[in-house]
Curated annotation (Swiss-Prot):
Task of the protein: Core subunit of the mitochondrial membrane respiratory chain NADH dehydrogenase (Complex I) that is believed to belong to the minimal assembly required for catalysis. Complex I functions in the transfer of electrons from NADH to the respiratory chain. The immediate electron acceptor for the enzyme is believed to be ubiquinone.
Protein name: NADH-ubiquinone oxidoreductase chain 5
Key words, A-Z: Electron transport, Membrane, Mitochondrion, Mitochondrion inner membrane, NAD, Respiratory chain, Translocase, Transmembrane, Transmembrane helix, Transport, Ubiquinone
Alphabetized InterPro entries for the sequence: NADH_DH_su5_C, NADHpl_OxRdtase_5_subgr, ND/Mrp_TM, NU5C-like, Proton_antipo_N
Coiled-coil zones: none
C-alpha cells in the first residue's frame, strides 16, 4: 500500500516537473509548452485519484515517507512527506481546479507574448503548494510557504509595465513578510526547545509545555498568508494581476496556505483555550469587516476578492471552534465556486473590452447566458444555498458555532457576515446580469470558445457535487450533534434569506431619496475599506517621515549648529584663558614653573640611577 502511495505521488511530481525541465533540453518543445502543461496537470489529477480511492476504500489514516537529507550532531532534517486525509484530498482538488484554470488561461491570455513563461509560473505555484500540504516537517513546509509567496509576487506583478501591478505585488510581499516573521520565530522556538522540526515528534514532545508564544507566531503567519484582519489589504490589491492568477491564488493555493497550516498543526493548540479564542475572535472580525467592505465595491474582481477574505475569516472561526475538519471541508468546497466566479468575471471583462466596473455592465443575462448561469450558480454556492457545495461546509460551520456554547459575540458577527454575503452576491448579479446594457455597443462579446466553456462546466459540476461527494466519503474526526432545535438548524439559511430580502429592500430605497445630500458615513466607511489603507499606507508613513524630519532638523539646530557656532566660541575662550593665565609677566609665576621643572628632572634622574 505504501508503495502505491509513494509511486503515485512520485509520478505526479515527475509529470508536473516535466514541462519545466524539458524546454532546457529541447528548444522546439517551448512552442508546445502550453499544451504539454495542460496534459501534465490532467494526467496528474487522474493519477491522484488512485491514492484517494485507496484511502477511502481501505480506511487508511496516515502514511509517512522519510528520506534522509541533512545530518547535524544535535539536529536532523529529513525530507518527510505525509499522506493523510488533508494532503490527499487537497492535492486532487488543487489539480482539478488548476486544470480548469490553465484551460481558461489559454483563451484569456492567448495574445500575451510571454504566455509560456506564465504557464511555468502557474505550474511552479501549484508545485510549491503541493509541497506545502504534503510536508511533514517545518523546514519543508517553510520551503513551500516561501515558494507560494515568491510565485504570487511574480504573478501579481505580471503586467510590470503598470505601476499599480508593481505596487500590489510589493504590497503582497511586505504583508506576507510580516506574517513570515511569526512562522520563523515559531520554528526557532521549536528547534531550541524541542530540538526537532518533525511534526509527529514535536506534537508528542510538546504535550506538557506552554506553547502560547510559538502558537501566536503561527497565528501571525496565518494572518499574513490568509489575509486576516490587520494584514488583509494586500488581497484586494492583488486583483491587479491577470484573472487566472486571481482564480488560482484565491481558490487552491496561497490564501488557503495559512488556514491549512493551522489545520495541519491543530493538535498543538486544541487544548489551549487562549489561542482558540484568539482564532475565533480574529476570524469573526475578519469575516464581518471584509463582508462590509464588499457591500459597496464597484470593481467586479474586488467584490469576489473580499468575499474570499470573508470566507477565510469563516475558516478561521472554525479553527477557533476546534473543528479543523470543517475548516478543511470549506477550503475544498470553496475552491470550486470561487475559481468559477473568477473565471466568470474574466469572461465578462474580456467580452466588455477590459471593463471591470459593474456600474457599466448590465443585461448580460441575455448576451452571455452561459457565463451568467455559472455566475449565478457560483454566487448561490457562496451564499450557502441548500445542496450546493458551499451548503455542506458553511451550514455545518454555522451549526457548530450555534451549539458550541462559546463566544456569543463571535456568533453574532459571523451570522451578520453570512447575511451580508447574500447582499453583495445579489448586488453583483443585479448589476451585471439584470437591467439594461450600460456598456459600449462595440464590445467584442463572445463566449462560444471551448477553452472558456469547458473549464466553467467542470467547475460548475464541482460547485454542485463536490460538497456531497466529499462529505459522503471522508469520515468526520468528531462526533456530530444529532439533535438540535429547528431554528438553530436552519439559522444559516434564515440569515441568508434575511440578507436577500434586505438587499431587495435597499435596492428599492435607492429610488426614494428623501434628502438632496444624504448621510453617507456608513457607505464611505465601506467604500473606503474602513479607512484602513488611507491610514496605514498614507497617514502613518507621512507622519513617520514628518517626525523623522522634525527630529533630524531639531537635533541639528539644537546640537550641531549650536556646538559648532556659539558654544564653540565659548569653548575657545575658556581654552584661551587657561593658556593665557600663566603668561601675565609676574616673576613669581616664572620662578615657580622653573623650580617645578628642575625638581621633576631631579626626581626622574634619581629614579633612573636607582633602577640601573
Amino acid at each position: 500500500m505504501n508503495y502505491i502511495f509513494n509511486l503515485s505521488y512520485f509520478m505526479i511530481l515527475l509529470l508536473l516537473l516535466y514541462p519545466l525541465i524539458l524546454p532546457l533540453c529541447q528548444k522546439f518543445f517551448d512552442k508546445n509548452l502550453e499544451k504539454h502543461t495542460k496534459w501534465a496537470i490532467k494526467l496528474s489529477f487522474f493519477i491522484s485519484l488512485i491514492p484517494l480511492t485507496l484511502f477511502i476504500d481501505q480506511g487508511i489514516q496516515t502514511i509517512i515517507m522519510n528520506i534522509s537529507w541533512i545530518h547535524l550532531p544535535l539536529f536532523n532534517i529529513n525530507l518527510s512527506f505525509k499522506f493523510d486525509m488533508y494532503s490527499i484530498m487537497f492535492t486532487s482538488v488543487a489539480l482539478y481546479v488548476t486544470w480548469s484554470i490553465l484551460d481558461f488561461t489559454s483563451w484569456y491570455m492567448y495574445s500575451d507574448p510571454n504566455i509560456n513563461r506564465f504557464f511555468k509560473y502557474l505550474l511552479l505555484f501549484l508545485i510549491t503548494m503541493i509541497l506545502l500540504v504534503t510536508a511533514n516537517n517545518m523546514f519543508q513546509l517553510f520551503i513551500g510557504w516561501e515558494g507560494v509567496g515568491i510565485m504570487s509576487f511574480l504573478l501579481i506583478g505580471w503586467w510590470y509595465g503598470r505601476a499599480d501591478a508593481n505596487t500590489a505585488a510589493l504590497q503582497a510581499v511586505i504583508y506576507n513578510r510580516i506574517g513570515d516573521i511569526g512562522l520563523i520565530l515559531s520554528m526557532i522556538w521549536l528547534a531550541t526547545n524541542l530540538n526537532s522540526w518533525e511534526m509527529n515528534q514535536f506534537m508528542v514532545l510538546s504535550k506538557n509545555l506552554n506553547l502560547t508564544i510559538p502558537l501566536l507566531g503561527l497565528i501571525l503567519a496565518a494572518t499574513g498568508k490568509s489575509a486576516q484582519f490587520g494584514l488583509h489589504p494586500w488581497l484586494p490589491s492583488a486583483m491587479e494581476g491577470p484573472t487566472p492568477v486571481s482564480a488560482l491564488l484565491h481558490s487552491s493555493t496561497m490564501v488557503v496556505a495559512g488556514i491549512f497550516l493551522l489545520v495541519r498543526l491543530n493538535p498543538l493548540f486544541q487544548n489551549n483555550k487562549e489561542i482558540l479564542t484568539v482564532c475565533l475572535c480574529l476570524g469573526a472580525l475578519t469575516t464581518l469587516f471584509t463582508a462590509i467592505c464588499a457591500l459597496t465595491q464597484n470593481d467586479i474582481k474586488k467584490i469576489i476578492a473580499f468575499s474570499t477574505s470573508s470566507q477565510l475569516g469563516l475558516m478561521m472561526v472554525t479553527i477557533g471552534l476546534n473543528q479543523p475538519y470543517l475548516a478543511f471541508l470549506h477550503v475544498c468546497t470553496h475552491a470550486f465556486f470561487k475559481a468559477m466566479l473568477f473565471l466568470c468575471s474574466g469572461s465578462i471583462i474580456h467580452s466588455l473590452n477590459n471593463e471591470q466596473d459593474i456600474r457599466k455592465m448590465g443585461g448580460l443575462n441575455n448576451i452571455l447566458p452561459f457565463t451568467s448561469s455559472c455566475m449565478v450558480l457560483g454566487s448561490l454556492a457562496l451564499t450557502g444555498m441548500p445542496f450546493l457545495a458551499g451548503f455542506f461546509s458553511k451550514d455545518a460551520i454555522i451549526e457548530s458555532l450555534n451549539t458550541s456554547y462559546l463566544n456569543a459575540w463571535a456568533l453574532i458577527l459571523t451570522l451578520i457576515a453570512t447575511s451580508f454575503t447574500a447582499i453583495y452576491s445579489l448586488r453583483l448579479i443585479s448589476f451585471t446580469m439584470m437591467g439594461h446594457p450600460r456598456f459600449l455597443p462595440v464590445s467584442p462579446i463572445n463566449e462560444n470558445h471551448k477553452l472558456l466553456k469547458n473549464p466553467l462546466k467542470r467547475l460548475a459540476y464541482g460547485s454542485i457535487l463536490a460538497g456531497f461527494i466529499i462529505t459522503s466519503n471522508i469520515p468526520h474526526n468528531k462526533s456530530m450533534i444529532m439533535t438540535m432545535p429547528p431554528l438553530m438548524k436552519l439559522m444559516a439559511l434564515l440569515v441568508t434569506i434575511v440578507g436577500l430580502l434586505l438587499a431587495l429592500e435597499l435596492a428599492n430605497l435607492t429610488t426614494k431619496q428623501f434628502k438632496i445630500l444624504p448621510n453617507m458615513k456608513m457607505h464611505n466607511f465601506s467604500n473606503m475599506l474602513g479607512y484602513y489603507p488611507p491610514i496605514i499606507h498614507r497617514f502613518l508613513p507621512k507622519m513617520s517621515l514628518k517626525w523623522g524630519q522634525t527630529i533630524a532638523t531639531h537635533t541639528m539646530d539644537l546640537n550641531w549648529y549650536e556646538k559648532t557656532g556659539p558654544k564653540m566660541t565659548e569653548l575657545n575662550q575658556k581654552i584661551i584663558k587657561i593658556i593665557h593665565s600663566p603668561q601675565k609677566g609676574v616673576i613669581k609665576t616664572y620662578l615657580t614653573l622653573s623650580l617645578l621643572s628642575i625638581i621633576t628632572l631631579l626626581v626622574f634622574f634619581n629614579l633612573s640611577l636607582n633602577h640601573s
